[in-house]
Amino acid sequence: MSRKTVFPKVMCTQHPDSASKYIATQEEPGEAIEAAQIFGCDEYMPDYEGKATPYHQNVQVVSKFIEETDLIPGKDIIITPRAPSAVQENQFRQLMVMMSIAEANYNALEYSDVQAINEFVHPMTDSVREIIGAQQHMVDVSELAKKEFGFSMEVPCIIPLIEDAPALLHAKELAENTLFAWKGHFGTVPDKFRVFLGKSDSALSFGHVASTLSCKYAINGICELNSELDTQTGIIFGAGTLPFRGHLDLMNAENFFKEYRGVGTITLQSALRYSHKKGDAESLVKLAKARLPETPELFSAEEKEEIINLIGIFGASYSRIIRQLAPTINRIADLLPQQRDRLMHKGTGGYSRSAPDISGLVNLCRTDIGKELEASMPAEDLQLPRAIKFTGALYSIGLPPEFIGTGRALEEAREKLGEAACENLLTKYFPSLAGDLNFASEYLDLNVASRFLSSECLKEVSKDLDILHGAFALETSPEPSYRILVEMMQPDLLQAGSRGNCMDEEVSQLVCSTLTKMGKIRKALG
């Protein structure tokens, strides 16, 4: 089999992380054109996961490229929708998106013999059964299109999106077992297969360090598959601009490309396009096209074991604090602006993120570390907001989540795994950690954060910061205008402005305006 398949390098997405711009669904087809013609992206992702995206957006995007540009969808610009999860949302919405993929391909056939849409993303993937089931739905829709309209298309191939730390640690096995199951179920295997890895949700559940290590472990494993299987595998890496969500921006590009070697495609999210300096997004796209993919440094069996135990230690230290902060996070997240048309947070039409099944991680950790990780997890789902608002909420009270649990975990790792393991963490496994913490320290204000923390929580966070100051010589000096805004954050003010209270409209507007201004200064909502 030829190994010359070139995967797209930059996928433009509809993530609602811009602090400066709201984009309605009817504007998104135009955004797709802008992504290709202005920013230089070679892939665009119409997003139906948790969003009120209309059925016909896939058709609109494909038609707009055909009618208004010289770019051929499926050749010059790759269109890759993200369908909803049949488990987390409902199967009807998933089938709706698949029907719209078929319709978009049918309409495009009139203008080109190139199929417009050839892949689709499946979110929050946990199992081979889920992947094969969704792929079978796509086969069924393709057969229905042939039966009803006499229209034959190549069945679009699923891209599983893996988003929590335990699943990321089993990404290689999931991809490998999927391809074996594919052969058994469909009688053949695809000659190329992409896997989408998400940084944000694993960070939300396990913290910044555990999330980064989990993603790198997954990248490492999937890269190993390329030398073991006939199917060529590619990796899409979903990252935002703030460190907690990946730290993908022009200023940090060199660190990012070194940190995540092996990734073939990056996401260009809304914050970088609309909230960063004009020209930054275009420059990053050019850089990514020149650099990706870079050869990964593969880990040894001993290093993998060490990484897993580090993930367990950092995840436990983070989780013990975050469960205490959940009410505050939810209250602030409720007041952050909605920058895309999302489905309702609760009920049958939408969903929030719930706690992952950690058994797959606990079983890999050393026994004592696994037990502490289990003990750190909340007894029931916290129903936290989505990752962007989660991150924005913590930044808005002067406590960037990158710091939570990190100092204490570093000390614990030194005690339990030894000095060499900590040295490996800082020089080999996660060399960008110092840079990430220095960036986040510009938005750290413990005096303000202390207003929202219990005495126990404040004690633990203060210890985190003391250890990190000693280890990294951090300079915690918030930008002056940001300091003024964050000083305005008072628990009573938030309570007055939160939804569900009889609020004064001016107070509510003041709180929302302040939160938005802080987002603009840090160049991302979250």
Curated annotation (Swiss-Prot):
Pfam families: PEPcase_2. Keywords: Carbon dioxide fixation, Lyase, Magnesium. Its EC number is 4.1.1.31. One of its GO terms (molecular function) is phosphoenolpyruvate carboxylase activity. The keyword DNA-binding does not apply. GO terms for biological process: carbon fixation; oxaloacetate metabolic process; tricarboxylic acid cycle. It comes from the Archaea. Its cofactor is Mg(2+). It catalyses: oxaloacetate + phosphate = phosphoenolpyruvate + hydrogencarbonate. It is an enzyme of class 4 (lyase). InterPro entries: PEP_COase_arc-type (IPR007566), Pyrv/PenolPyrv_kinase-like_dom (IPR015813). Homotetramer. NCBIfam families: PEPCase_arch. Belongs to the PEPCase type 2 family. Catalyzes the irreversible beta-carboxylation of phosphoenolpyruvate (PEP) to form oxaloacetate (OAA), a four-carbon dicarboxylic acid source for the tricarboxylic acid cycle. This is Phosphoenolpyruvate carboxylase. It comes from Methanosarcina barkeri (strain Fusaro / DSM 804). The lineage of its organism: Archaea, Methanobacteriati, Methanobacteriota, Stenosarchaea group, Methanomicrobia.
